[in-house]
Amino acid sequence: MKNNDSKISKYISLILRHKPEEIGLKLDEHGYLGVLDLIEGLNKSYKGFSMDDLERIVREDSKGRYSFNEDKSKIRANQGHSIKVDLGLEAIKPPKVLYHGTGRKYIESILKNGLIKKERQYVHLSKDIETASIVGKRHGDLVILEVDSESMFKDGIKFYLSKNNVWLCDYVKVEYIKEISLL
């Protein structure tokens, strides 16, 4: 990514997940914004921002946060919305276990209340410890939680897999959570 791309990518994430009104726009029911509208809005803060810049940011984003529709006339975040959108995801069977990385400061609450989606549409889970670790390190002293997704699924909990391979569900009860050691 170019020097400013990381900063612009974070701003695009804010717009596409939480605050499209920052640039005077509104997401459609599926979370999409018109690409030309987004570029015009971004040009208020980032003069000269173009379709080439947007395509590069989407292509080079290591987390795969964004996707275009087929003709690249619209763009959306693949998950992480605090705004209600229908991503059109089908419920599917998850792996036997999934993982959630978090900070030590949140463990007491999680072990009391479970994993809750808070301001997001879904709880985010990872298929492997490595990915959960990357996510969890942002929250301070890292703790990895193992989630018994097989039992959750058997108990009727629905799981979804986002386009960028983040596992999503509405809630994880305490009984399905186990703290694991990284030794």
From Swiss-Prot:
Q: Which InterPro entries match?
A: Ptrans_KptA/Tpt1, RNA_2'-PTrans_C, RNA_2'-PTrans_KptA, RNA_2'-PTrans_N
Enzyme Commission number: 2.7.1.-
Keyword check for Transferase: yes
Which is one GO molecular function term here?
tRNA 2'-phosphotransferase activity
Q: Biological process GO annotation list? A: tRNA splicing, via endonucleolytic cleavage and ligation
Q: Which domain of life is it from?
A: Bacteria
Q: Which UniProt keywords apply?
A: NAD, Transferase
Q: What does this protein do?
A: Removes the 2'-phosphate from RNA via an intermediate in which the phosphate is ADP-ribosylated by NAD followed by a presumed transesterification to release the RNA and generate ADP-ribose 1''-2''-cyclic phosphate (APPR>P). May function as an ADP-ribosylase.
PANTHER family assigned to the protein according to its UniProt record, in alphabetical order: PUTATIVE PHOSPHOTRANSFERASE, TRNA 2'-PHOSPHOTRANSFERASE 1
Q: Which family does it belong to?
A: Belongs to the KptA/TPT1 family.
Tell me what this protein is called: Probable RNA 2'-phosphotransferase
Q: Which organism is it from?
A: Clostridium perfringens (strain 13 / Type A)
Q: What is the lineage of its organism?
A: Bacteria, Bacillati, Bacillota, Clostridia, Eubacteriales
Q: Which gene encodes it?
A: kptA
